[in-house]
């Protein structure tokens, strides 16, 4: 019985790490959704919540990384367990960056709150934000569920989000030429599109880390 105890303790610590990973993943998903919703309907209280959540995600990831490193040092895990712990560190870093990007989106949305945004660029951005939210959700659940098929789908999704970015860029630029006085605020649409593209890139990176965790092979 004594020989089994360290293994039982290890499994408990591993389970706790997974729980922490699930919590920060859910908070990141909700924070990103809250940020992109500000594009359609700005709300100062929600914007402040995004900023607050971004800081909370940073703290949560720091604690997760500390637990993961401590687990590696104390238990010296091997094979699949080691790859999972290392993946938690890597994915946590991506989630932290996504939290920062959500805050950037919220701050850019604030600059647009009193402006008359042309319909087509706004529709493009809404479509892009919905698609990126789907990518982020897919990347996170692929990791948590260790779903290879879902992780591999993200590669195709990345091409789609690049197309959506190009489309948004085209329509925003056209609107700028039609009304040069709008340039000062429409540039924020381009910033938001770029932030969304980066979130999409992070979702793909999470999927790639999932594939490596499962197969120990480069995606």
From Swiss-Prot:
An example Gene Ontology biological process: intracellular phosphate ion homeostasis
Source domain of life: Archaea
Lineage: Archaea, Methanobacteriati, Methanobacteriota, Methanomada group, Methanobacteria
Swiss-Prot/TrEMBL keywords: Cytoplasm, Phosphate transport, Transport
Protein family membership: Belongs to the PhoU family.
Name by which UniProt lists this protein: Phosphate-specific transport system accessory protein PhoU homolog 1
GO MF entries: protein homodimerization activity
Function: Plays a role in the regulation of phosphate uptake.
Assembly: Homodimer.
Keyword Acetylation carried by entry: no
Pfam annotation, one family: PhoU
Predominant place of localization: cytoplasm
InterPro entries linked: P_transport_PhoU (IPR028366), PhoU-like_sf (IPR038078), PhoU_dom (IPR026022)
Gene Ontology cellular-component annotations: cytoplasm
Subcellular location: Cytoplasm
